[in-house]
Amino acid sequence: MRTFVLRARAAPTNSRALLEGVGNEAHTEILAHTLMNTMFVAQSHRQDVVVHLVLESTKDFSRTITIHSNEVSNVGGFHEANLLNIVVRALDASTGMGKEELRNVEPGVTVRTISFERLVQQLAENHQLYMLEKKGEFVRDIKFAANPCFLLTDHIPMPKKTFNSLKRLGTQNISLGPKMLFASQCVTLIQNELDLQE
């Protein structure tokens, strides 16, 4: 199983604000682009991929929307608007949730009121964590673990305190090259490296 976590620090947990953020300061389109490039290939979709989108611009709790590629069925078409609608439906389903609650949204999609830090702690129990870092080990020099989990962020960098927490969880820093890339570009390169190692 390949797992990806996108920490979307600027993404609102209000569905209307999320849609208004497309192409604006929040850059919520990154959610759709990352979903597209983690879960789909030409004329098909990838098996055994899990994507966690952690939306953090909120008045109450972060929302973690989880999509399982093997189970998701209600995409409705391969374009940005339909992929964002998955996120919108999950946010609407999360209205009124308390801390660390879980709701099923539709086949293959759940929403939880759980923070990035708590999610990563849970994932570290049965995944090898990899964090993209410019000074990390070059991706081509790494033999990936059997159950990898890749941690990415939107255009707002991770807080410095997060790096210490991730280090304690055994996170390995990896680099995709000298240029800073969009999260949606990173996942394409990571998927390709994993494909080559299979």
From Swiss-Prot:
Record keywords, A-Z:
Cytoplasm, Methyltransferase, S-adenosyl-L-methionine, Transferase
Q: Where in the cell is it found?
A: Cytoplasm
Question: Keyword Cytoplasm, does the record have it?
Answer: yes
The residues that the entry says bind S-adenosyl-L-methionine are: L132, C186
The record's Gene Ontology cellular component field reads: cytoplasm
Asked whether the keyword Nuclease is assigned, the reply is: no
Q: Which GO terms describe its molecular function?
A: S-adenosylmethionine-dependent methyltransferase activity; tRNA methyltransferase activity
CDD domains this protein is in? TrmY-like (cd18087)
Q: What is its EC number?
A: 2.1.1.-
* GO terms (BP aspect): tRNA methylation
- Similarity field: Belongs to the methyltransferase superfamily. TrmY family.
NCBIfam families per the UniProt record, alphabetical: PRK02135.1 (NF002560)
Q: Protein name, please?
A: Putative pseudouridine methyltransferase
Which organism is this protein's natural source? Vibrio vulnificus (strain CMCP6)
Task: Give the organism's phylogenetic lineage.
Answer: Bacteria, Pseudomonadati, Pseudomonadota, Gammaproteobacteria, Vibrionales
